[in-house]
Amino acid sequence: MADDKGTDPKEGCSDFIYLEAECSDISDLDNDLETLLEEGAGSDISDLINDEVVEQGNSRELLCQQEREESELQVQYLKRKCFSPKAVQELSPRLQSMNISSEHKSKRRLFVEQDSGLELSLNEAEDSTQELEVPASAPAPAAEGDIGLGTVRDLLRSSNSRATLLSKFKDSFGVSFTELTRQYKSNKTCCHHWVLAVYAAKDDLIDASKQLLQQHCFYIWLQSFCPMSLYLCCFNVGKSRDTVVRLIATLLQVHENHILSEPPKNRSIPAALFWYKGSLNSNVFCFGEAPDWILSQTMIQHQTADTLQFDLSRMIQWAYDNDHIDESIIAYQYAKLADIDSNAKAFLAHNSQVKYVKECALMVRYYKRGEMKEMSISAWIHHCISKVEGEGNWQHIVRFIRYQNLNFIMFLDKFRTFLKNLPKKNCLLIYGPPDTGKSMFAMSLIKLLKGSVVSFANSKSQFWLQPLADGKIGLLDDATDVCWQYIDSFLRNGLDGNLVSLDIKHKAPCQMKFPPLIITSNINLLKEERYRFLHSRVTQIDFPNKFPFDSDNKPLFELTDQSWASFFKRLWTQLELSDQEDEGDNGNSQRTFHCTAREVNGHI
């Protein structure tokens, strides 16, 4: 049997009970408690409990301040679209209130659909002024006040420097800078004339600039009202804004941000009067002669007596005299005359320039065509060679013909009948191997006589023969076998010298005869039996030899306008061309054609 657990029962009670049961007398316990309390009065944990009267501090004020800041932040988030913080305006409200031009708000829509609210939000955003929203930030501590103020000054200097200079310029000169200038958005755009407003330049440097700028400008206008100085510089060559600003900043020792630079308004009469009247003041320095855009708007001239109106007939007369029939050339060349011609200036100011250019080109073509139709072939050749400048050598053409193994007398006979446009003799075929000078010979003649060129590549169009109606001579270059089949099928009547019906665009088919027609080809028709019906209608000339060139790859025979003009003058009688005296041309004393009603006392 196992030992029993617990205390030993043999001795009755264990020692633990006796040990714990011993206690001191009650009187002794009371004395010990009093002693303990007396000794503990001077211990380190004395005054642990504060029994003094509690006073209310500033905790309520701090709580109210925190709640107020939190409420303001929440209200600001809710009303961010209506009340955006404007840091720059709060820094300088007086400067922000200065406006050079009036501001206009965007127009509201009259009828807005009340649907999902998306459109209302868009309209609300459009009605508000488009400004950069600055997020709210906590105020800087007192120790960081200088650093924050320096940042604000840099921001104000970089963002509002132009507005500040414009305000100071208007206070000094009494006129807005933008009223005198037009705006160039790009700093790389070049202009001869520049208006410069310089801020805070030294007087001695301003006086020195009067002499230093004379080597760059042909006209200088300078007036100074402290602290602003106004320059009008007309440079000898066109300069960009970057170049001009660097030049002025170097001469006057100022920062580039202190310079306003724009080109002047050269079409504004008030601006021109400002510069002109200013040049009469004693405190204004002027060097050189005033530019034309100032004089033309301020000086009284006889041209200003009449109202500046555009006259289309004068433009047509100019295009006719200069042989301009292309619309792009007419528009460009006439616009270049705006500085010296009042009618060209009125043309640029008109809103219907495209209409006038088209009408001018069309009328010139009508006049030229009527003039050509009135002339005979002899008169037309004389008219063309009279406009050739320079001297040529007719022997180059003669040597080239002999180089091709042709009898020159036989060539003259064929060429004479060709120019007379005789029936079945009005088509001249130049055939031979490639690179023999066929096209060069024919093109040089067509260029002198201002003939028309047709191309078989456009044969699918029914108007491909229309240019033949506008020329005294025609050319069909490089006729292939397909082209000869077309000629054999449809153009026999034209080669016979009879009237044909020619379809012209935007017009009814007209009745006309083909002009003398030159055809170049590599095919010899006499050896083609299938084209036997063309043998009697075509006069053939063979060019068997290749065109020669020298060591510098230049042609040995000069087939130019001067050479052909000399050729016709030399062989005028042999070609049986009519005498110009018989046709009424007795020299250049006759009055040229004019299409405008010139006044007796008008300009010559």
UniProtKB/Swiss-Prot annotation:
GO terms for molecular function: ATP binding; ATP hydrolysis activity; DNA binding; DNA helicase activity. ATP binds at residues 432-439. The modification Phosphoserine is found at residues 84, 92. GO terms for cellular component: host cell nucleus. It catalyses: Couples ATP hydrolysis with the unwinding of duplex DNA by translocating in the 3'-5' direction; ATP + H2O = ADP + phosphate + H(+). Residues 144-307 are annotated as: DNA-binding region. There is a cross-link at residue 513 (Glycyl lysine isopeptide (Lys-Gly) (interchain with G-Cter in SUMO)). Residues 406-556 form the SF3 helicase domain. It is found in: Host nucleus. It is an enzyme of class 5 (isomerase). Gene3D superfamilies: 3.40.1310.10, P-loop containing nucleotide triphosphate hydrolases (3.40.50.300), Zinc finger, large T-antigen D1 domain (1.10.10.510). Keywords: ATP-binding, DNA replication, DNA-binding, Early protein, Helicase, Host nucleus, Hydrolase, Isomerase, Isopeptide bond, Nucleotide-binding, Phosphoprotein, Ubl conjugation. It comes from the Viruses. The keyword Isomerase applies. Its EC number is 5.6.2.4. Phosphorylated. The keyword Phosphoprotein applies. One of its GO terms (biological process) is DNA replication. A motif (Nuclear localization signal) lies at residues 79-81. Belongs to the papillomaviridae E1 protein family. HAMAP family: PPV_E1 (MF_04000). Can form hexamers. Interacts with E2 protein; this interaction increases E1 DNA binding specificity. Interacts with host DNA polymerase subunit POLA2. Interacts with host single stranded DNA-binding protein RPA1. Interacts with host TOP1; this interaction stimulates the enzymatic activity of TOP1. ATP-dependent DNA 3'-5' helicase required for initiation of viral DNA replication. It forms a complex with the viral E2 protein. The E1-E2 complex binds to the replication origin which contains binding sites for both proteins. During the initial step, a dimer of E1 interacts with a dimer of protein E2 leading to a complex that binds the viral origin of replication with high specificity. Then, a second dimer of E1 displaces the E2 dimer in an ATP-dependent manner to form the E1 tetramer. This is Replication protein E1. It comes from Human papillomavirus 38. The lineage of its organism: Viruses, Monodnaviria, Shotokuvirae, Cossaviricota, Papovaviricetes.
